[in-house]
């Protein structure tokens, strides 16, 4: 089959999916329609906004479907009118069987980990949180159980020791787009070979990657410095690690922490975890084992700033601590 004969449906919402959609179109594939979530209120003003995928699909002039319910018969009927050979899912939502079984070639998914490791909604975050030095992307055949389908292609990617979620996210989206195009290329040649995840290395010890909520983002300083550092960078810039600065006889302040550095892995300073060590330029916090240097943070109602700017405008005292 030729590229121009292969009818594709693309399903995605988050900006992670945009490079994949762009790559398919730029490589000559015929995306007949794009399925994305309905517009919803976003940001402080709760302004109703479209997804990034919808905005890009509008630029391309592609038909856009935004069903509230993926099981609605009207949506299924409209999807059938495009007679897709293959459906592609990137950063979307769980599909009912009636949708993913529709095309004769099936439905494939792009996932931000080396499956079977980190099945779930937040694979990039969890790879950083666990201190992994390598991750990657996987394309696989969709089936009902989340992220369990047979693997088509995988490609590895190193993780920098100081790399944040936001930085790795962008690199993963770019790599994922390339791997996805190569995967679709395989379908032009016939039925691609796929491997059950049970046969892949690490299947028995695979970690899950559940969605991360705001309540999960509070920093626990009663952990080794390396773990605290990995936790903070795993959710920077969003949903963002936070902690409380306690001030005697005053209300505590919530601080968002964006970037840190481990300056002591073995404790040389004495003191309780959460104790603050500072001078004119540096803001350090003791952990259970070692010391973390805060490089970038944010106070309520203020913009993100470096530690020196914070110290210049905020008077710390020896009876304050972080928790």
UniProtKB/Swiss-Prot annotation:
InterPro entries named among the record's database cross-references: Fmt, Formyl_trans_C, Formyl_transf_N, Formyl_transf_N_sf, Formyl_transferase-like_C_sf, Met-tRNA-FMT_C, Met-tRNA-FMT_N
Reaction(s) the record says it catalyses: L-methionyl-tRNA(fMet) + (6R)-10-formyltetrahydrofolate = N-formyl-L-methionyl-tRNA(fMet) + (6S)-5,6,7,8-tetrahydrofolate + H(+)
Classification via Gene3D superfamilies: 3.40.50.12230
Broadest EC class assigned to this enzyme: transferase
SUPFAM superfamilies with a match to the protein in the record: FMT C-terminal domain-like, Formyltransferase
MF term (GO), any: methionyl-tRNA formyltransferase activity
Highest taxon, organism lineage: Bacteria
Binding site for (6S)-5,6,7,8-tetrahydrofolate: 113-116
One GO CC annotation: cytosol
EC number annotated for this UniProt entry: 2.1.2.9
Pfam families: Formyl_trans_C, Formyl_trans_N
Keyword Transcription on entry: no
UniProt keyword list: Protein biosynthesis, Transferase
NCBIfam families for this protein: fmt
Family under the similarity heading: Belongs to the Fmt family.
Purpose of the protein: Attaches a formyl group to the free amino group of methionyl-tRNA(fMet). The formyl group appears to play a dual role in the initiator identity of N-formylmethionyl-tRNA by promoting its recognition by IF2 and preventing the misappropriation of this tRNA by the elongation apparatus.
Name of the protein in its database record: Methionyl-tRNA formyltransferase
Species per Swiss-Prot/TrEMBL record: Porphyromonas gingivalis (strain ATCC BAA-308 / W83)
């Amino acid at each position: 089959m030729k590229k121009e004969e292969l009818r594709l449906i693309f399903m995605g919402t988050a900006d992670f999916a945009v490079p994949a959609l762009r790559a398919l179109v730029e490589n000559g594939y015929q995306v007949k329609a794009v399925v994305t979530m309905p517009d919803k209120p976003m940001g402080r003003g709760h302004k109703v906004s479209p997804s990034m995928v919808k905005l890009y699909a509008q630029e391309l002039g592609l038909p856009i479907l935004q069903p509230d319910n993926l099981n609605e018969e009207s949506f299924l009927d409209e999807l059938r009118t495009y007679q897709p050979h293959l459906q592609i899912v990137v950063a979307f939502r769980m599909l009912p069987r009636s949708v993913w079984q529709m095309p004769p070639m099936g439905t494939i998914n792009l996932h931000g980990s080396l499956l079977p490791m980190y099945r779930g909604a937040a694979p990039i975050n969890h790879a950083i949180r666990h201190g992994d030095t390598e991750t990657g992307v996987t394309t696989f055949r969709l089936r009902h159980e989340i992220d369990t389908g047979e693997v088509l292609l995988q490609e590895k990617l190193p993780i920098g020791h100081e790399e944040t979620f936001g930085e790795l996210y962008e690199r993963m989206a770019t790599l994922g787009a390339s791997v996805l195009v190569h995967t679709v290329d395989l379908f032009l040649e016939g039925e691609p070979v796929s491997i059950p995840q049970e046969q892949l290395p690490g299947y028995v010890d695979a970690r899950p990657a559940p969605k991360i909520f705001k309540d999960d983002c509070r920093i626990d300083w009663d952990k080794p410095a390396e773990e605290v550092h990995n936790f903070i960078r795993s959710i920077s810039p969003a949903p963002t690690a936070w902690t409380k600065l306690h001030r005697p006889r005053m209300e505590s302040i919530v601080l968002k922490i964006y970037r840190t550095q481990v300056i002591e892995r073995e404790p040389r300073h004495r003191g309780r975890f959460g104790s603050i060590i500072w001078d004119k330029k540096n803001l350090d916090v003791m952990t259970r084992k070692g010391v973390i240097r805060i490089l970038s943070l944010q106070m309520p109602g203020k913009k993100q700033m470096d530690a020196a700017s914070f110290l210049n405008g905020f008077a710390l005292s020896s009876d304050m601590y972080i928790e």
